[in-house]
A protein has these predicted regions:
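Surface-exposed cleft-lining segments at the edges of enzyme active sites
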Residues: 134, 197-209, 237-238
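Catalytic alpha-helical scaffold of carbohydrate-active enzymes acting on polysaccharides/glycoconjugates
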Residues: 1-136, 141-186, 212-233, 239-288
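Glycine-rich, positively charged active-site loop/lid region within alpha/beta enzyme cores that binds
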Residues: 182-203
């Protein structure tokens, strides 16, 4: 599956030591619905999710603008329908909109036909906002269905960012190759900042921002030393968008840049990986 430049041995642009992806999952109050059900969450949990569109998103967009970063936002279709103006702001700022389910449904075993209908519906919503074809996929709550890669290839996706099996980008081979940009629970702000009394299905935690900064900085340093890796942060405006946390993230961005990071969006990194492997890089050439 993994070829010479498809992971181990890849050289990043301009002599950079590592590819860093600051990705955002804009889930709003739908983050945990498919696990707990709306009725199981108290209003405080729902309103905490709404902090993303109400306040956290603006802080994230402002920080990205200050640092001149264009990145990727994974947006469920239902969130784009409810918070259309906010998603338009994301697209207007030059960020990529990528698939993240329609209703952020993370049930294992969703029938393939149902999931393909979800994809078609969400793609149409996001494409109407951005004017661009959706080429990126992240499964809700990282629940990638067994047929998921095959369905991405069928629908002409360029990349996936769900699996956690290594620290480099690699290719799902086939007639229409799909790049995997792996994530890791330790790079997810949910692991450190999600706090809920009502949600018994997950942990209750709230770490200091400085603790997370040091953990992510140490991870960055070690991955950068290996020179062919990616570091894919998975962030949520409702969590990282709190005032002290977004400042922590901006400090980390500055540190990474000073120490050899290529900070880019998922589509740009995926196209680079394909090009390094002599693969087709025009996902628009694949008919849906």
């Amino acid at each position: 599956m993994i070829t010479l430049k498809n992971g181990d041995g890849i050289k990043w642009p301009h002599g950079k030591r590592i590819a860093v992806l600051l990705t955002f999952d804009f889930d709003a109050e739908y983050l945990r619905y498919s696990v707990t059900g709306q009725s199981a969450l108290g209003f405080s949990d729902i309103s905490r999710g709404q902090y993303g569109p109400h306040e956290g998103l603006k802080r994230c967009l402002d920080m990205l603008a200050r640092q001149n970063i264009k990145t990727t936002f994974f947006v469920p279709g239902i969130v784009a329908e409810k918070y259309t103006d906010e998603v338009k702001q994301i697209a207007a700022a030059g960020h990529e909109l990528a698939y993240h389910g329609y209703a952020h449904d993370a049930r294992p075993g969703i029938p393939e036909a149902e999931e393909e209908a979800n994809m078609a519906k969400a793609e149409a919503i996001l494409e109407a906002i951005s004017g661009k074809k959706v080429v990126g996929h992240r499964a809700p709550l990282d629940t990638l269905q067994t047929y998921g890669v095959k369905l991405m290839q069928k629908r002409g996706y360029l990349y996936s960012s769900t699996l956690k099996d290594c620290d480099w980008a690699y290719i799902h081979e086939g007639e229409h190759p799909v790049v995997e940009l792996p994530t890791e629970p330790g790079f997810d702000d949910f692991s450190f900042f999600y706090f809920s009394y009502a949600d018994a299905h997950t942990i209750t935690c709230s770490y200091p921002a400085e603790y997370v900064y040091n953990m992510w900085k140490d991870a960055f340093d070690e991955l950068a030393n290996e020179s062919d890796k990616i570091m894919c942060l998975k962030l949520h405006p409702q969590l990282i968008g709190r005032s002290s946390r977004i400042r922590m993230l901006e400090r980390l961005v500055l540190y990474m840049r000073q120490n050899g990071a290529w900070i880019a969006g998922c589509e740009e990194v995926a196209r680079y990986v394909l090009a390094q492997n002599g693969k087709e890089t025009d996902a628009d050439a694949v008919a849906k």
